[in-house]
């Protein structure tokens, strides 16, 4: 599949500092691609190279099959760039609404460059407000709306030019948890209804887990880990990724305090991660029956990834080496991802 967005060898440098350092990122049509990292990681700077609100110091930017920037130069005319930008909507933490204009006037403002009649402007603006669930608030002013409602207006305005890409730059970070989830669910629905590709910039793993199918983790200007959300979630390679994954791998944090020196010679700790949709019965109970053993459950948790419940268990098995191998083989036959837990797994980067 040809990527809809292809960022190749992107570097953005401010003086001696590289805010983005040689990053490669491919985003396919229809993806909800989460770009996550702490403040200062470079995620907003990177994503702003997509619509060239930020020119790279090096690297190339290709969107929808058109190379926009390469070898330090713009590859399209200024007019062409403006047209391309209109097909890339953007929403921010600050809603950037016009306080003296009504909700419908705020949406229509994004269409002022068009040749639509007043009636057509009104019809399209109302349609966009209906998409975001605010048609009944068309004559309200921003000050009369809640934070979540104002962000919905911003989303409607970002969709005014029928973009096929929407960049969400920390758009939910100023909202309370309930409203955040409502906005994320709206973005997810728009992705499905409109085939909209969404680039979700955030420092909150819960936001990525709720709606994204892909993820890139950034640290100090570099993408340190990327790929399918489920794969990265189940097999985080870097310490920062493990930190963001958090809840589902809370077992690792708990087991950091475990006294491994006191384990019996044959005892081993394992982390089991599996889709609850794939498991109809208790895998541990099945294991006990199959191998005539008794696994001790030290930890259990359930996370939800884009609507898919993922279970995590930490178990202790006291078996000889051959039985340990049989246990792992049995669990893997049940679509369980098995990771042996020791101090190296728990603490090493």
Curated annotation (Swiss-Prot):
Subcellular locations according to the entry: Cell membrane
Signal peptide: none
Annotated catalysed reactions: L-methionine(out) + ATP + H2O = L-methionine(in) + ADP + phosphate + H(+); D-methionine(out) + ATP + H2O = D-methionine(in) + ADP + phosphate + H(+)
EC number: 7.4.2.11
InterPro entries given in the database record: AAA+_ATPase (IPR003593), ABC_transporter-like_ATP-bd (IPR003439), ABC_transporter-like_CS (IPR017871), ACT-like_dom_sf (IPR045865), MetN_ABC (IPR041701), MetN_ABC_transporter-like (IPR050086), NIL_domain (IPR018449), P-loop_NTPase (IPR027417)
GO molecular function, one term: ATP binding
Keyword line: Amino-acid transport, ATP-binding, Cell membrane, Membrane, Nucleotide-binding, Translocase, Transport
Domain annotation ABC transporter: ranges: 5-245
Gene Ontology, cellular component aspect: plasma membrane
SMART domains membership: AAA, NIL
Protein topology in the membrane: Peripheral membrane protein
Residues bound to ATP: 37-44
Top EC class of this enzyme: translocase
Family membership noted in the UniProt record: Belongs to the ABC transporter superfamily. Methionine importer (TC 3.A.1.24) family.
Annotated function: Part of the ABC transporter complex MetNIQ involved in methionine import. Responsible for energy coupling to the transport system.
Complex formation: The complex is composed of two ATP-binding proteins (MetN), two transmembrane proteins (MetI) and a solute-binding protein (MetQ).
Protein name, per record: Methionine import ATP-binding protein MetN
Organism of derivation: Lactobacillus gasseri (strain ATCC 33323 / DSM 20243 / BCRC 14619 / CIP 102991 / JCM 1131 / KCTC 3163 / NCIMB 11718 / NCTC 13722 / AM63)
